[in-house]
Amino acid sequence: MDHEQTRKELAAAFRWAARLEYHEGVANHFSAAVSDDGQDFLINTRGMHFSRAQASRLALVTSSDRASDPVAENVDATAWILHSYIHRNVPRARCILHTHMPYTTALASLKNFEFLMLDQNACRFYDRIAYDRHYAGMALDPSEGERVASLLTDGKDILFLANHGVLVVADTIAQAFDELYYLEKAAQLQVIALSTGRELQLVDNETAALACKQWREYPEAAELHLAALMDILDIELADYIK
């Protein structure tokens, strides 16, 4: 199987992450599982700029046997460790997006910060964020992948990585990118609101929980969002599907 549609959607996610300035150099990594057990997944190759992502250029790797898989050797080491462990150990993580996008990373770098229920977008993430509060350097040891995967429990789909960035997991590419987009929007608003020094008017927990449920049940919102983004690319940068 060539997983054509998955490749196209993931390439579109890369292109839009670049357009929205979520990327950082040729670092950061997105992946999408293509096997039921999560051991086979598509991921960006080492050194690929997000703005140049193409469906055919994404690496198909098998996490059960890296040493004998030459394709896997062209994948960033930290990407390999994080994504392989999460795909294998978190069944709902069919798509994993990891970025150092500025506003979310800024909040993740505040001591003991908890994401504020400040607006409708923030309420989408009510009780869904996990926090890794200790930065221990780059994820170059397999134990780090195992540790990070263990934090994505109890329905937590977003992981704030202290002094580092954020990781989003979802069942589909459309859902994951929609989460990433609205997370950064909500984080941007929080940074702006905090910068005023004024008292914040927060949404109460009951209302935040209701809004979160409404977000989750809103019909086809994520799919429509990705389809619209792909339509734009089809007109302006159609080479992403090659």
Segments from the language model and where they lie:
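Glycine-rich flexible loops
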Residues: 1-242
